[in-house]
């Protein structure tokens, strides 16, 4: 389908900042012979572009973030952009909904993609369907980079929480 990656020579998991520039690559035709017919090539293109573009946005915050946050929020952006495609429902089998006792922040076994339903719940619970601000707020709290969201200056680190703690604090606010 596609991928998003950084070629930023300064991006490093051991550096003081975890933000990185990014570029995305998408398949050139989403041919049914390659991807099947569960969606049209245009639908595959739409959800893949939304998903990968959101990864590029995530890289601005922290490209080494937990997979459940990265993939789950990218999946929910597919739903935001192309709600009628419903490709993301294919991942509900690997979610806390269908596997009681599995942590919502599990980052393996496909559960990182199935976490989208948790993010969708938060968006709907906040009545933010048109503008899912809660997702941005959680990314800002979890960011490894200094992001000036409080007017304290770009060199003031006020975030850098683990993803689950960032989500908990934003929801509790």
Give the positions of each predicted feature:
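Juxtacatalytic substrate-recognition/specificity segment
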Residues: 1-66, 73, 84-87, 98-101
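Stable alpha-helical elements in mature extracytoplasmic
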Residues: 41, 45, 49-53, 69-73, ...
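Generic, well-ordered alpha-helical scaffold segments in large soluble proteins
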Residues: 56, 122-125
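Post-HExxH zinc-binding segment in Zn-dependent metallohydrolases
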Residues: 64-110, 116, 120
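Secretory-pathway/luminal and periplasmic proteins that interact with or process carbohydrate-rich
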Residues: 81-86, 144-150
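Structural helix-adjacent loops and short alpha-helical linkers that scaffold large soluble proteins
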Residues: 82-88, 125-135
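Beta/coil-rich, acidic/histidine-enriched accessory regions frequently appended to metallopeptidases
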Residues: 145-173
């Amino acid at each position: 389908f596609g991928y998003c990656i950084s070629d930023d020579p300064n991006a490093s998991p051991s550096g003081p900042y975890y933000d990185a520039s990014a570029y995305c690559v998408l398949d050139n035709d989403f041919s049914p012979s390659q991807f099947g017919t569960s969606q049209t090539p245009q639908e595959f293109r739409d959800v893949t572009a939304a998903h990968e573009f959101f990864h590029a946005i995530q890289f601005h915050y922290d490209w080494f973030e937990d997979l459940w946050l990265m993939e789950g929020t990218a999946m929910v952006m597919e739903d935001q952009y192309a709600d009628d495609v419903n490709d993301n429902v294919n991942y509900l089998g690997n979610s806390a909904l269908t596997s009681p006792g599995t942590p919502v922040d599990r980052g393996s076994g496909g559960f990182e993609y199935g976490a989208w339903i948790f993010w969708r719940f938060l968006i709907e619970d906040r009545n933010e369907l048109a503008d899912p601000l809660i997702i941005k707020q959680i990314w800002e709290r979890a960011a490894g980079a200094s992001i000036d969201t409080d007017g304290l200056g770009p060199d003031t680190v006020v975030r850098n929480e683990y993803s689950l703690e960032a989500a908990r604090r934003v929801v509790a606010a």
